[in-house]
A protein has these predicted regions:
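Family-specific signature for flavin-dependent thymidylate synthase
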Residues: 1-227
Length: 227
């Protein structure tokens, strides 16, 4: 069993390269505006988004490959179903998990005793998986012993509005730390993908307290007032 900290997000080239130009063009048609100017299209898109007309974000497709994320986060990722996202997950039926990797939470890695217990537990699971396999148990059944902390891979397709809505919840300081790290990586990778994405990321990806100007959580972290 290996414990690693590795880059989690890769943006696939099918992702919309010029999201603001696309949005501005589509909106311009609706408004009867001149759509031949890229600068005007970008300005029109920024204006729409800044005014809260988020439906236009649904024109923008984002294709992502995620790796080295926990099975726990992968399972919870599926709860964000708005915008008809599509996803595939690495299959424990076909992939040999006899040497699986695991996510190491900081609260465990920073505690010597906790790290020891966590590592021992994972090693025991690994030995059990291998023993079941040697007894002729199919991979799909051996996988029943695998932990939620095991790393997995996802192939994802979202639109920008769906990802924006996810960021409201998952960039919150009360969200699970792994989600917050994933969104940091996602924003960094999209910002590198094109200049228009760098601008769009600054407009739409933020925790809901920043988006709404107040905290809407019952159990607030105290970062921002509830009123």
């Amino acid at each position: 069993m290996n414990v690693k900290k590795i880059e989690r997000v890769r943006i696939v080239s099918a992702t919309t390269k010029t999201p603001l130009t696309l949005i501005g063009t589509m909106v311009g048609v609706c408004q009867g505006s001149d759509t031949s100017s890229q600068d005007k299209n970008i300005g029109r898109a920024i204006s729409c988004i800044s005014q809260g007309h988020y439906r236009v974000l649904e024109y923008v497709d984002v294709y992502i490959v995620m790796s080295h994320i926990s099975a726990r986060v992968a399972r919870e990722w599926y709860t964000h179903i708005g915008g008809q996202p599509t996803r595939l997950q690495e299959s424990t039926r076909y992939v040999d998990c006899a040497d699986f990797n695991a996510v190491m939470p900081p609260s465990i890695s920073d505690n010597i005793d906790a790290f020891d217990k966590y590592s021992r537990c994972l090693d025991m699971i690994l030995k059990t998986y291998k023993a079941l396999s040697e007894l002729g148990v199919p991979r799909e059944d051996c996988a029943m012993v695998l932990p939620l902390g095991m790393t997995t891979k996802l192939s994802l397709k979202h639109n920008a509005r769906n990802l924006m809505d996810m960021s409201r919840q998952r960039m919150c300081s009360r969200a699970y730390w792994e989600y917050r790290e994933i969104f940091k990586d996602l924003i960094a990778k999209l910002s590198e993908y094109s200049n228009e994405w760098k601008t769009l990321c600054s407009l739409i990806f933020k925790p809901k307290c920043e988006a709404f100007g107040k905290c809407t959580e019952k159990n607030s972290c105290g970062r921002m007032n509830k009123n």
